[in-house]
Amino acid sequence: MSQKMDFDAIVIGGGFGGLYAVKKLRDELELKVQAFDKATDVAGTWYWNRYPGALTDTETHLYCYSWDKELLQSLEIKKKYVQGPDVRKYLQQVAEKHDLKKSYQFNTAVQSAHYNEADALWEVTTEYGDKYTARFLITALGLLSAPNLPNIKGINQFKGELHHTSRWPDDVSFEGKRVGVIGTGSTGVQVITAVAPLAKHLTVFQRSAQYSVPIGNDPLSEEDVKKIKDNYDKSLGWCMNSALAFALNESTVPAMSVSAEERKAVFEKAWQTGGGFRFMFETFGDIATNMEANIEAQNFIKGKIAEIVKDPAIAQKLMPQDLYAKRPLCDSGYYNTFNRDNVRLEDVKANPIVEITENGVKLENGDFVELDMLICATGFDAVDGNYVRMDIQGKNGLAMKDYWKEGPSSYMGVTVNNYPNMFMVLGPNGPFTNLPPSIESQVEWISDTIQYTVENNVESIEATKEAEEQWTQTCANIAEMTLFPKAQSWIFGANIPGKKNTVYFYLGGLKEYRTCASNCKNHAYEGFDIQLQRSDIKQPANA
C-alpha cells in the first residue's frame, strides 16, 4: 500500500547548513519543508560549543552568509575574529529575519531515516516515535558535532564537575577550583587559555604538543569596519574563487626559493599579523606539500615556544614532534599560559593517565592530581560521526554504518550511492575550507539539483558507484600530494581509537570543487542514476 508523503523535504540540522537549506527549498523552490534539531534553538555546532574562549579562526566578516546583503551591512563587527556568542546571535538574526524557525521542530532528535524504495520516500522517525515521510532528505548534521568522549578507566566515578567542551552548561564557575583539561587540540588550546586566569589551579593533560600561532584578534576601528562593509562583494567573491575561502593571499612562493633571512622575516610578519591559515598558506606556497619547507615552519614555531616559555623543561614538553600538517591552530596566548604559577603541564604520552578516581587523576608514575573539575577537550568523531551513529538505511535496508565500515565515501561530499534523494551538507570528502562558503556552495547545488528533479519529472537521483569511487580516489590522490596524511590528525580520523585512518576531505580547494559541481550539473548530472517518476508516486507539491 502506497504511503502518504507528508513533506517534500525533511532537513536535519539547525546550523549554517540546515538554515540555508530550509530557506532555499521552502522560500525559493516553494517546497513543503520540515526541519528538526535536537537543540532548543538554532545555531547547530555553535549552539553546543559554549565553552570559555570559543572563537572562530575565520575573520568575522567572512564567517557568515553572502546572500543576505542587508544583514551583512548591519552586522556588528567589533574584533577581527568572532566569538561563539556572536555566531549564535548572528544565526538567530538570520532565522528571525527569514522566519525559518516556523519550519523547525526543536528539542527533537531524529532517531532513524529509512528509504522506502516502493514509494520512493524517506521515512523519518524522531526520538518520540513520530513518523514523517518526504521525497528528499537533507542532512546538515555538522562536521564537528559528534562528541568524542575519552575512554579512560574510572571516568564515570569522578564526583567533581565533569564537562565536555561540546556540551558546555551555563554558569560554570572556576573560582577557587582545581581544574584539569584533557586535550590540547584547537578546542583545548582555547579553553586552556581562557580558564587559566580564572581557576585556582589548572592542570593540562597533553597527549600531543601542538603548533599554534597567535590569532591576532585585534579590535577593529570604525574605519576598518567601514572598509570591510564597502568591500563585502569583493571579499566574498574572493572566497568563492580561492582554494581556502579565507580571502587571504594564498602564496605560490616556495619557501626555499628565498634566503634564510627573508624566510624568517616572512614568518615573523605572519606571526605578528596572526591567524593559523594565514601562517600556513599566506607565507609560502609549499609548507603543506614540501618537507623541507614544512621543517622551516616547524623550526620557526619551535623557536617561538622556546622564547615565550620561561621554563626550558616545560618548553621542551610543548615542542611538537609531528609535522606541521594538521588543521592550523591559532591562539590568544596559549604558550604564555604555561608561565603562570597556577598552571601545570602533564605529558600523558610519557606519563599516561592510569585511572580517574572520585577526586582526581592517577598517573603511571604514581602521581595523583586532585581536581574539583575535569574538562574533556577531546574533540569530535568528525565528519561521519553523526552519520554512523544515526540509523540511516538506504536501498535494500543498507545501513550507512555498514556501508561506511571501511571508511566513508561520497560523490562530491553531497551524495552517496545506495541512498537516493539524500543530500549531505559537509558530508565526507567535501571541501576543506572556511565552512560558510562551502556550505553555501553545497546547499545551492542541492537546491538546483532538487529543482531539476521537480522540473524533469524525476522520481529519484542517486550517485553511481563509479562516480563515488572515482571522487573518493580523487580525494585520496590529492591528499597524497600533501603532507597532511603523514600527521596524526582528526582530519584523517586519527583522534578516534579504532577508526580507520583515511581521507575525509577534498583538499583541492573551493574554486576547483565548485567547478566540479558545476560541471556535473551542466552535463545533465553526469555520475548520477536518474529514475523518472512513476504514475503511482506522489510528486512534490510544486510539480
From Swiss-Prot:
<dbReference type="GO" id="GO:0018667">
    <property type="term" value="F:cyclohexanone monooxygenase activity"/>
</dbReference>
<keyword id="KW-0274">FAD</keyword>
<dbReference type="GO" id="GO:0009056">
    <property type="term" value="P:catabolic process"/>
</dbReference>
<keyword id="KW-0058">Aromatic hydrocarbons catabolism</keyword>
<keyword id="KW-0560">Oxidoreductase</keyword>
<dbReference type="GO" id="GO:0050661">
    <property type="term" value="F:NADP binding"/>
</dbReference>
<keyword id="KW-0285">Flavoprotein</keyword>
<dbReference type="GO" id="GO:0004499">
    <property type="term" value="F:N,N-dimethylaniline monooxygenase activity"/>
</dbReference>
<protein>
    <recommendedName>
        <fullName>Cyclohexanone 1,2-monooxygenase</fullName>
        <ecNumber>1.14.13.22</ecNumber>
    </recommendedName>
</protein>
<feature type="binding site">
    <location>
        <position position="16"/>
    </location>
    <ligand>
        <name>FAD</name>
    </ligand>
</feature>
<feature type="binding site">
    <location>
        <position position="63"/>
    </location>
    <ligand>
        <name>FAD</name>
    </ligand>
</feature>
<feature type="binding site">
    <location>
        <position position="57"/>
    </location>
    <ligand>
        <name>FAD</name>
    </ligand>
</feature>
<dbReference type="InterPro" id="IPR050775">
    <property type="entry name" value="FAD-binding_Monooxygenases"/>
</dbReference>
<feature type="binding site">
    <location>
        <position position="37"/>
    </location>
    <ligand>
        <name>FAD</name>
    </ligand>
</feature>
<keyword id="KW-0503">Monooxygenase</keyword>
<feature type="binding site">
    <location>
        <position position="110"/>
    </location>
    <ligand>
        <name>FAD</name>
    </ligand>
</feature>
<dbReference type="Pfam" id="PF00743">
    <property type="entry name" value="FMO-like"/>
</dbReference>
<comment type="similarity">
    <text>Belongs to the FAD-binding monooxygenase family.</text>
</comment>
<keyword id="KW-0521">NADP</keyword>
<dbReference type="InterPro" id="IPR020946">
    <property type="entry name" value="Flavin_mOase-like"/>
</dbReference>
<feature type="site" description="Transition state stabilizer">
    <location>
        <position position="327"/>
    </location>
</feature>
<dbReference type="GO" id="GO:0050660">
    <property type="term" value="F:flavin adenine dinucleotide binding"/>
</dbReference>
<dbReference type="InterPro" id="IPR036188">
    <property type="entry name" value="FAD/NAD-bd_sf"/>
</dbReference>
<feature type="binding site">
    <location>
        <position position="46"/>
    </location>
    <ligand>
        <name>FAD</name>
    </ligand>
</feature>
